[in-house]
Amino acid sequence: PHDPLRRQRQMCIRDRSQHLSSGASKVILTAPAKGDIRNIVFGVNDSALKESDKIISAASCTTNAIVPVLKLISDNYGISNGHIETVHSYTNDQNLIDNFHKGDRRGRSAPLNMVITTTGAVKAVSKAIPELKDKLTGNAIRVPTPNVSLAVLVLNLDRSVERDELNEFLKTSAFASKYREIIGYTNSPEAVSTDFYSSPYATIIDSQATIADGKQITLYCWYDNEYGYTKQVLNLTKKVASIDLQRFPKAIEDSV
């Protein structure tokens, strides 16, 4: 029988394989991949990479922003289910003025509207964190700002946690764990989106906005969807290319 999804996966692999046949040893996609292609979020599941992986996905900017935080919460508190809402700067997939678009609402003028649309980031989460498969829903609101986006994570946990305890855990993880180079943390009561232009982190937790009510928590995570994501892609590229630059002084041992 005809399987359109299988055909789509085959086309995706075939199209990217043309780079390999032209002499490239590896291909890294800067978008979520379907099928059997690995979706890698550097710093979280890059240890799953194998030498035999020729085509690799660096996932999306939003996936890179939410996966490190979701992994932290899942490992330490457990996640029963949740919803991810991303308030995302508009992109070149949208129209500058009202026009036709296969995505209906995305056809409306991007600089003039907030646009409710879909996000593929949540589906990509389960490729990086398999235990969260079918536990999360997601949506996106495209807004008329040029850069820096915000992910809102509403999660139901397996055990209760107080707000101060949760923020302290997130702060410690951001400053003294293996995630310290990809997770940022701010407690500024005046923080707004432009404060995070050119942030090198994949995500920055806004502790002032944290909500904890028993087993339900809400986290607000800023991310520069251009620069922060590019940093993640570069780190993944260096790993794939086996580029290991020495750092001084020697990095501290990971505590988390």
Give the ranges of each region predicted by the language model.
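Rossmann-fold NAD(P)-binding glycine/threonine-rich loop
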Residues: 14-54
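Short acidic, glycine/serine/threonine-rich loops at helix termini
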Residues: 38-42, 68, 94-100, 232
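Rossmann-fold dehydrogenase core element
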Residues: 42-61, 78-85
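NAD(P)-dependent Rossmann-like dehydrogenase/reductase catalytic/cofactor-binding core
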Residues: 200-256
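Alpha-helical support elements that line or immediately flank enzyme active sites
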Residues: 14, 20-23, 30, 60, ...
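C-terminal substrate-binding/catalytic lobe of Rossmann-fold NAD(P)-dependent oxidoreductases
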Residues: 78-217
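Single conserved hydrophobic/aromatic residue that forms the stacking wall/gate
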Residues: 1-9, 13
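Flexible, glycine/proline-enriched loop segments at strand-loop-helix junctions
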Residues: 7-10, 52-61, 109-113
